[in-house]
From Swiss-Prot:
Annotated localization: Cytoplasm
Keyword flag Iron: no
Organism: Burkholderia ambifaria (strain ATCC BAA-244 / DSM 16087 / CCUG 44356 / LMG 19182 / AMMD) (Burkholderia cepacia (strain AMMD))
Name the UniProt record assigns to this protein: Urease accessory protein UreE
Bias (Basic and acidic residues) ranges: 171-188
Family according to the record: Belongs to the UreE family.
Length: 202
């Protein structure tokens, strides 16, 4: 089995013909956050991905195998929420509230995109946005800090999310119980906050 153990820096320009001939490894966002991964190229070949801890792969990245061959990374379509608003201020408010909850968000021209979450979808609709579940590649913003950062869910996060859950439960006639007394103090790579949507911890 070949091992993909190097990522070519984004500022290094490769010949387009080389990249075009490279096989593709299509991965969802959670998989692109993992530094150790068993995966299958689109050609059907099984490979091992072994990268420095904290590496977050993006669509279009190029990896180098231990035999010198190139492999191109593609972001796989996955279930996401596409968020739009009638005015920029409403969309900005939505982005603020999502950021306050440490939610990975892709920011585009007139839209936000996040992993599917019924509690957050309900909150976003209450803020006045239009929320549409769809299947699309997900590429959230990289973190503002250069290296991996360490944090747990603080009291503000727990209170905010508990309130969101309560509102969701009242609106839908049922509630979702999610414990937050377990430890979340672990390392993440830059911009990689998967598993911190409050109730989907892997």
């Amino acid at each position: 089995m070949r091992t993909l153990d190097k990522r070519i820096a984004p500022n290094v320009k490769l010949a387009a013909s080389l990249v075009a001939r490279a096989p593709t490894l299509t991965l969802a966002y959670d998989a692109r956050c993992k530094s150790r991964l068993a995966a299958t190229l689109d050609t059907g070949e099984d490979v091992a991905v072994v990268l420095p801890r904290g590496t977050v792969l993006r669509d279009g990245d190029v990896l180098v195998a231990d035999d010198g061959a190139l492999v191109r990374i593609a972001a796989a379509p996955e279930t996401v929420l596409l968020v739009r608003a009638g005015d920029p201020l409403t969309l900005m408010r939505a982005a603020y509230h999502l950021g306050n909850r440490h939610t990975p968000v892709e920011i585009g021209d007139g839209y936000l995109k996040l992993e599917a979450d019924p509690v957050l979808a309900d909150m976003l609709r209450r803020l006045g946005t239009q929320v549409e579940p769809t299947s699309a590649p997900f590429q959230p913003e990289a973190g503002a800090y250069g290296g991996g950062h360490k944090h747990g869910h603080d009291a503000t996060f727990a209170e905010d999310y508990a309130l969101a859950q309560q509102v969701f439960g009242e609106h839908h006639g049922h509630s979702h119980s999610h414990d937050h007394d377990h430890d979340h103090d672990h390392q993440h790579g830059p911009g990689c906050t998967h598993g911190h949507r409050g109730h989907d911890h892997h």
